[in-house]
């Protein structure tokens, strides 16, 4: 039997902040992982938004 390992790495969803405010249909979301021990705050990364066709700020959502 495999033992359960309680890890610090969790999956998080990043959603485009600029697209959300624009009111256009659709959403740009990315899934990534982060280490809860090292990164206690919410992630904010610049990622490519294919709907707006440019690099935008993506924030972690719950």
Swiss-Prot record:
Gene: rpmG
InterPro entries, alphabetized: Ribosomal_bL33, Ribosomal_bL33_sf, Ribosomal_zn-bd
Coiled coil: none
Name the UniProt record assigns to this protein: Large ribosomal subunit protein bL33
HAMAP family cross-referenced by the UniProt entry: Ribosomal_bL33 (MF_00294)
GO-annotated molecular function: structural constituent of ribosome
Recorded family membership: Belongs to the bacterial ribosomal protein bL33 family.
GO terms under cellular component: cytoplasm; ribonucleoprotein complex; ribosome
A biological process from GO: translation
Keyword field: Ribonucleoprotein, Ribosomal protein
């Amino acid at each position: 039997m495999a033992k359960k390992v309680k890890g610090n790495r969790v999956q998080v969803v990043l959603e485009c902040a600029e697209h959300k405010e624009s009111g256009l249909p659709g959403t740009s979301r990315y899934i990534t992982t982060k280490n809860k021990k090292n990164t206690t705050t919410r992630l904010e990364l610049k990622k490519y938004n294919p709907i707006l066709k440019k690099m935008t700020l993506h924030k972690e959502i719950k």
